[in-house]
Design a protein with these regions (language model features):
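Acidic catalytic patch
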Residues: 102-117
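Helix-adjacent hinge/juxtasegments
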Residues: 65-104
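Short alpha-helical interface patches
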Residues: 30-35, 79-92, 108-109, 124-130
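Exposed alpha-helical structural elements
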Residues: 6, 57-58, 85, 96
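Short, contiguous alpha-helical
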Residues: 7-23, 27-75, 115-162
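Basic/polar N-terminal segments that are highly enriched at the extreme N-terminus
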Residues: 1-5
Length: 162
């Protein structure tokens, strides 16, 4: 089983990679970023926002027992009209995540977490893995979309980013 220190290391990697992708996406035109490319959430913009909402919803709200306070308007891609707005949301969400990770300890990993969109409770350790894997597979999707545009994606290998 992973420890709080393991998760802090993983989340430091996650944040570094997320920032690299934010920088890469910021170099694209808004038209390219928001174009429907028939992906899971249609556009790279929407996919990236989805990753941020996973962090924000699971860690900044559900894990803190504040599921009723999730700011759904922040989670709606239609409310974003520039990459600057998305970066502001990312910085805000990740500030909460960093604070959460700083306070994480091993006993908290077994805490039961509920989410309004799921029927069952899940241990915090599983929630943290879900957030990590969600980022990985959606960034993989963005990588494929960048390749379709002949754009080299940011480096995201664990070894190069830790």
């Amino acid at each position: 089983m992973s420890t709080a220190d393991d998760f802090r290391r993983i989340f430091a990697y996650n944040e570094k990679v997320l920032q690299s992708f934010s920088n890469a996406l910021s170099r694209l035109s808004w038209e390219t970023l928001s174009k429907n490319m028939e992906a899971s959430h249609n556009s790279m913009k929407n996919i990236f926002i989805h990753i941020l909402t996973v962090y924000n919803g699971w860690i900044n709200y559900n894990a803190l027992g504040k599921s009723d306070s999730i700011p759904w308007e922040q989670h709606d891609p239609k409310n974003y009209n520039s990459m600057n707005q998305i970066v502001e949301f990312m910085l805000s969400a990740m500030k909460g995540v960093t604070r959460f990770m700083d306070e994480l300890n091993d006993p908290k990993l077994s805490k039961k977490i509920t989410a309004p969109w799921m029927e069952e409770e899940h241990e915090l350790s599983d929630v943290l893995m879900q957030v990590t894997l969600e980022q990985a597979h959606h960034l993989g999707e963005i990588i494929a979309l960048l390749w379709q545009l002949n754009i080299e994606p940011p480096q995201m290998t664990w070894i190069d980013n830790t």
